[in-house]
Amino acid sequence: MFLLPRFVLVSCIIGSLGFDNPPTNVVSHLNGDWFLFGDSRSDCNHVVTTNPRNYSYMDLNPALCGSGKISAKAGNSIFRSFHFTDFYNYTGEGQQIIFYEGVNFTPYHAFKCITSGSNDIWMQNKGLFYTQVYKNMAVYRSLTFVNVPYVYNGSAQSTALCKSGSLVLNNPAYIAREANFGDYYYKVEADFYLSGCDEYIVPLCIFNGKFLSNTKYYDDSQYYFNKDTGVIYGLNSTETITTGFDFNCHYLVLPSGNYLAISNELLLTVPTKAICLNKRKDFTPVQVVDSRWNNARQSDNMTAVACQPPYCYFRNSTTNYVGVYDINHGDAGFTSILSGLLYDSPCFSQQGVFRYDNVSSVWPLYPYGRCPTAADINTPDVPICVYDPLPIILLGILLGVAVIIIVVLLLYFMVDNGTRLHDA
């Protein structure tokens, strides 16, 4: 009987040490309340339309195609749709949000606004944009696009100043110079309106450098003024460079209201599209899967830069993207990462997704959900353990101390009895 508690304790410890519950490199969900934003690698409609039944084109398991939990468009991305005429209305809602897109705007596309511009600035813009998207989708359920109506009282129209290859910027819109202005040293305004959403992500952009036109250099200056609250948001050019600069964007999170766009120099810019954020939720980190090309094309790491704990978990493959349909579609590593969407998981962390909530040899960093902090094992050969690790250790120490005390007492009484017998 004395040995039974120690046997149970030892069995529990052995069972706990023998149970393997490592974090897995997948994206998953706690329950059915989830949504995925993607591109061709998760665009079921694209596969059905152009490659019937050839689902090797995707990294997504085709069993998820009828789930109604995916908004994806081949050849597009949320960033691309936000800024350019090549538009797809990404729309979705869920408690747990997953992103697997972004590859359709990379250094491979080499976009820059002007011939002497810089694609590096646009990669910086991409990182800043996705930072706002990821942070806000950790606290909002719903994402979609909305048009932003504006009123400009002049006669000039918007102009396609910023374009490269097939990409033409239309958000923000550039209002051309009025015919009666001899240069770009003028102030001009336009009203725009935000309504129908809880909050909005809108661009505020300037050329951060000396912009040359007809032998004159100009410093860009743009402001948005909230006429309801009196709050003003603004950017002024601070760089003195004349080449190698481009369109620097900040991404503001604004409430509904009436706004005034103001330009003090160069061309007026006005937002035409916004990310519509709706339905506040309890904080739930988003999950982002790296979106990159095969190494034959140049990619960037901007989604990784944007995805930081505690609001975001980033998942990536350790090998080059090598597809089975073509080199850029149907990679085994990324298919494995997305396979976690086929089942529920209790715990998410920076290291990965835990399949069980009982015990693990890896302590979860930035945990979310029901994460493994105690043993709870029930196998045919091992009794159920209901101890946290610390009490188990303390109990072992106490048992050891008790054994030592018992041995000391036994020796004491044996010596004492021997002395009494000798005296008798």
Swiss-Prot record:
Membrane topology: Single-pass type I membrane protein
Residue ranges, Virion surface side: 17-392
BP term (GO), one: fusion of virus membrane with host plasma membrane
Keyword Transmembrane annotated: yes
Localization in the cell: Virion membrane; Host cell membrane
Secretion signal, residue range per the UniProt entry: 1-16
Catalytic activity: N-acetyl-9-O-acetylneuraminate + H2O = N-acetylneuraminate + acetate + H(+); N-acetyl-4-O-acetylneuraminate + H2O = N-acetylneuraminate + acetate + H(+)
A Gene Ontology term for the protein's cellular component: host cell plasma membrane
Pfam family, one: Hema_HEFG
Domain of life: Viruses
Stretches in topological domain Intravirion: 414-424
Keywords: Disulfide bond, Glycoprotein, Hemagglutinin, Host cell membrane, Host membrane, Hydrolase, Membrane, Signal, Transmembrane, Transmembrane helix, Viral envelope protein, Virion
EC number: 3.1.1.53
Chain residue ranges for the region called Esterase domain 1: 7-127
Oxidoreductase in keyword set: no
Chain positions carrying an annotated carbohydrate: 54, 89, 153, 236, 301, 316, 358, 417
Residues forming the catalytic site: 40, 326, 329
Modification(s) after translation: N-glycosylated in the host RER.
Disulfide linkage: 44-65, 113-162, 197-276, 205-249, 307-312, 347-371
Positions of the UniProt region annotated as Esterase domain 2: 267-379
Annotated spans, Receptor binding: 128-266
Subunit structure: Homodimer; disulfide-linked. Forms a complex with the M protein in the pre-Golgi. Associates then with S-M complex to form a ternary complex S-M-HE.
Record-stated family: Belongs to the influenza type C/coronaviruses hemagglutinin-esterase family.
Function: Structural protein that makes short spikes at the surface of the virus. Contains receptor binding and receptor-destroying activities. Mediates de-O-acetylation of N-acetyl-4-O-acetylneuraminic acid, which is probably the receptor determinant recognized by the virus on the surface of erythrocytes and susceptible cells. This receptor-destroying activity is important for virus release as it probably helps preventing self-aggregation and ensures the efficient spread of the progeny virus from cell to cell.
The protein's name in its UniProt record: Hemagglutinin-esterase
Source organism of the structure: Bovine coronavirus (strain 98TXSF-110-LUN) (BCoV-LUN)
Biological classification of the source: Viruses, Riboviria, Orthornavirae, Pisuviricota, Pisoniviricetes
